[in-house]
Amino acid sequence: ETDTEAYICYGRIIFMKEELRIDIVGLAGACSYALDCIEAELVNITNKHGKRVAYISVCMAEYWAIQGEALQDLAMCALLHDNALTQYISEELKKDSVIDLKKDLSEEKTNLHCIYGEKNITKLPFKTDVSNVILYHHEHADGTGPFQKKWNEIPLFARIIHLADIIDIIRNSIDSDDNSWDFMCQYLSQNKDSLFDSECVNAFLHVFTKESFMCLSDDSFETKLWEAIPREKLVFDWEMCKDVADFFAKIVDYKSSFTSRHSIGVAEKASMLAQYMGYDSITVQKTVSYTHLRAHETKANL
């Protein structure tokens, strides 16, 4: 939703009203869908994986009475927990076009996409401190994860997302029948205090029943997810618009480094032109942001 109008007149971009209001959670949901499509294509992860991880995480949050801005930030982190997957894939494919991506992602280079992902989300407008949530979301409670951090060194949100992530991956790999809930409970019990900390295991078993767990196999969970998350539109300045566009660029452009360079190059040229024409710094930011956003909107519709 925007109260800003922009149009081009004789080579000049004219901006009207100043406010740009964006539903950042909805934007994260759209980004999650793009990531899911790529994961389904490359590593055979189930569709809507990010949204399921977010739903499981939001449900678990009830155990700690997490609400408001903190709940919104947890949902965003969960939706975008694998935001650097495409960036990592792109770099690995440049090195070796025949690598086994599924094996490579799961066994050897998990820490890289966590590092990239942590850096990427600094561009997004979180309301609370989410430092190290993405970085440590693959850590094990006993300290055997990629960074060898034990559960008491890991942010709660990272621990929640880690359990939710594994739950959905396992749920997708087993038959969805009457025995799947019992299998999951047994798995959590066997890996309590090793893969997962006992507090998160208790939280999951406290909020989920066999019936609610089985509902993860259909699309009804998505409606419940959006009902549970606070959805407040944020007023974006033009610098934030550019940061968000940069974040999307790393995902949308993973198959072609040219499209990424092209849209960034166009934005840079627009900035130079606006400065040459004597516009102030705010108008220059608007020009760059609008050009960036339009470029990615065009590519997303192709």
Language-model segment annotations:
Residues 1-15:
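Short, Lys/Arg-enriched N-terminal segments with co-localized hydrophobic residues
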Residues 17-18, 74-78, 121-162, 176-177, ...:
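Histidine/acidic-rich helix-loop-helix segments that form or flank divalent-metal centers
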Residues 24, 39, 80, 157, ...:
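Signal-transmission coiled-coils
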Residues 30-49, 95-101, 245-261:
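Active-site flanking loop/helix segments enriched in acidic
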Residues 43-74, 139, 145-153, 256-287:
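Alpha-helical phosphate/pyrophosphate-handling elements in metalloenzyme active cores
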Residues 52-61, 113-121, 180-192, 196, ...:
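An active-site-proximal "capping" alpha-helix that borders the catalytic cofactor pocket
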Residues 159-171:
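Conserved beta-strand-loop-short alpha-helix elements that form
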Residues 291-298:
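Conserved small/polar residues in nucleotide/adenosyl-binding loops
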